[in-house]
């Protein structure tokens, strides 16, 4: 009887260990599978190196499409393109053409191949194509509009290279400055009364807006969060914004989180200065804050609770800068584009502090927030171990 009970105990324990090992193995397989589609999808890029150049170019274009939101992931790029078609197929066509021409121009100019492969010469092009279509007063499918889309998107790698030469002295990214310069020049050169390429008429506010606080609609305020994220690409469809959030979450949950926080901060900041409700509902107060919050919240700074608060502050700052520039540029009939984001993010990245928890990453080491933190923690462990070894050697001597 004792032997049989011992056998039963051994059988139960072996079965438990087998279940535990199976669960652990299954968890590793799931983690490995998720690793293929999350983050930067390095395995995809490596696997395409010996494939047709067409597939490689498509990968670069998709990464460029998602790099607008600091995401280097072709799957996210596919979802973003789908979101653009949900918003407006004509805008999507113009945006895709802008990315293709911008990436192709970078190849012709022999720009850094790794930067091209990461989509860093495509994201300004997609924004140029989209915003030229968005601000066109000719309506959809005005095919002649593709001419300025091609020309202005081809100027983006030139502007990126020139600005990169200057900004590299401070180890700063160029962000969307090439897009801002290209689109602002185009809109200033054409205008509403242009014969070939008329643009939407933008005018400054000439009267006090009629704001009744009791009429504010909370559901529309909540909807403004995904809409504000969609407005990064000039889209006001909440479904498109939701698709963009999914695209961000696939690559980096931290980017997704800070995008939502940034859009929310932009909305709240707009309420504090009595911005007309329609502008808030359409997400026009949230997109610059979205980008600013992502940039500081783990992208170029290692994510800590201190940099998280700094990201929130940067989002609020970008919202107020955006309100100021909207009033100034509307006098000239120009939109703010993402000038407020660029100004705010660059100011916060030039911040100097003795707080070790606010650590700005070298530009060459920036990937995505989760990997950035892993890199930082590894560097810290290596530094501490080398310091301990040095002190031990000193004690021995």
From Swiss-Prot:
Membrane-topology descriptor: Multi-pass membrane protein
Entry coiled-coil feature ranges: none
One GO molecular-function entry: urea transmembrane transporter activity
Tissue-specificity statement: Kidney.
Recorded GO CC terms: apical plasma membrane; basolateral plasma membrane
Glycosylation site list: 210
Transmembrane domains' residue ranges: 68-85, 92-109, 115-135, 143-163, 172-192, 239-257, 264-280, 287-303, 309-329, 331-351
Compartments, record wording: Apical cell membrane; Basolateral cell membrane
Inhibition and activation profile: Inhibited by urea analogs and phloretin.
Reactions accelerated catalytically: urea(in) = urea(out)
Family membership: Belongs to the urea transporter family.
Protein name stated in the entry: Urea transporter 2
Organism, as annotated: Oryctolagus cuniculus
Gene symbol of the encoding locus: SLC14A2
């Amino acid at each position: 009887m004792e032997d049989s009970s011992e056998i039963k105990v051994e059988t139960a324990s072996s079965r438990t260990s087998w279940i535990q090992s199976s669960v652990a193995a299954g968890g590793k397989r799931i983690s490995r599978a998720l690793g293929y589609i999350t983050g930067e999808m390095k395995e995809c890029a490596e696997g395409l190196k010996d494939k047709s150049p067409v597939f490689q170019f498509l990968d670069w274009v998709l990464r460029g499409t998602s790099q607008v939101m600091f995401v280097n992931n072709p799957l996210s790029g596919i979802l973003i393109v789908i979101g653009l078609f949900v918003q407006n197929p004509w805008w999507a066509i113009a945006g895709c053409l802008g990315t293709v021409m911008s990436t192709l121009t970078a190849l012709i100019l022999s720009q850094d191949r790794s930067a091209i492969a990461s989509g860093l010469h495509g994201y300004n092009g997609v924004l140029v194509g989209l915003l030229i279509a968005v601000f066109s007063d000719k309506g959809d499918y005005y095919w002649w509009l593709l001419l300025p889309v091609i020309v202005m998107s081809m100027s983006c790698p030139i502007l990126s290279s020139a600005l990169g030469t200057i900004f590299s002295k401070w180890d700063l990214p160029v962000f969307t400055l090439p897009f801002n310069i290209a689109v602002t020049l185009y809109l200033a050169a054409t205008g509403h009364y242009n014969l070939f390429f008329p643009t939407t008429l933008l005018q400054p506010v000439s009267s006090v807006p009629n704001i009744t606080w009791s009429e504010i609609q909370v559901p529309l305020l909540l909807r403004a969060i995904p809409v504000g994220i969609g407005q990064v690409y000039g889209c006001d469809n909440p479904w498109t914004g939701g698709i963009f959030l999914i695209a961000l979450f696939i690559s980096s949950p931290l980017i997704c989180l800070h995008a939502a926080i940034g859009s929310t901060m932009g909305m709240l900041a707009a309420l504090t200065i009595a911005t007309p409700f329609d502008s808030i509902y359409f997400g026009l107060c949230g997109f610059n804050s979205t980008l600013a919050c992502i940039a500081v919240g783990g992208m170029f700074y290692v994510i800590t609770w201190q940099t998280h608060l700094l990201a929130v502050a940067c989002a609020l700052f970008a919202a107020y800068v955006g309100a100021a520039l909207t009033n100034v540029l509307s006098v000239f009939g120009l939109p703010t584009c993402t000038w407020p984001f660029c100004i705010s993010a660059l100011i916060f990245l030039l911040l100097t502090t003795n707080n070790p928890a606010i650590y700005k990453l070298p530009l060459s080491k920036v990937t995505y927030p989760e990997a950035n933190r892993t890199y930082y923690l590894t560097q810290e462990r290596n530094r501490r171990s080398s310091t301990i070894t040095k002190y031990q050697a000193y004690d021995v001597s």
